[in-house]
Amino acid sequence: MAQYDLEVVQRDLEAFGIALSGEQTGQFLLYYEMLVEWNGRMNLTAITEYQEVLKKHFVDSLSLVKVCRPGRGDALIDVGTGAGFPGLALKIAFPGLKVTLLDSLNKRIQFLNAAIEELRLDDVEAVHGRAEDYAAPGRGREGFDFCVSRAVANLSTLSEYCLPFVKKGGLFIAYKSEKGAGEVADAQRAMAVLGGRLRESVEFTLPDSDIRRNLVVVEKVQKTPAKYPRKAGLPSKEPIRGTEGKQERRGTS
């Protein structure tokens, strides 16, 4: 393994109250090397420069601790995980988590399975599938303490994909840019319909950077109606908005 300067990431994580062991640091470095290697064969990320990956992928993923700190034995699902952000990074930092990494592209699942094996991680699985299908009863529905997502979608759409996975009393956390705060008002109807309630929207800057981020935290207060999520494509084409209206009726008829 090549030698890397770890001072910056260690300082960044200290700002979040996270201290990594030598083993965890080694896992993150190996994760980085695998990401770059596999990215040469398939498009996993546009960000491959070492310091950028540390800041924009690893540190950003672990910023979850700004709003909550998962405990040992908690079950977490990452919807639309891509190359494993934030879910795999959270698993490394919090090894007691039980993590499911969900993505619709099989090539990403191949990378994730290779990374899980190489990093020697337990209680983590990569699942090839769509949120609309995996949220069916008897699979992942309402079986998780936390659902996280950095997927690029509006908050109403993400809520429909993610809230069905969260058990009552659990949390859905959406990783958004500084523009995420503007989506919150439009998404509150969707949150309510899906059994959620906005807990907080936290804006911050990643340590030693000008990168503005927003974590939107939604608490699951009641079960999601069985008709959600709707069939593939509808949550993004016709997101739940405003009052019970034309868009929602069209999508569920």
Summary of predicted features, one role per range:
Residues R108-Q110, G180, V184:
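Short alpha-helix immediately C-terminal to the canonical SAM-binding loop
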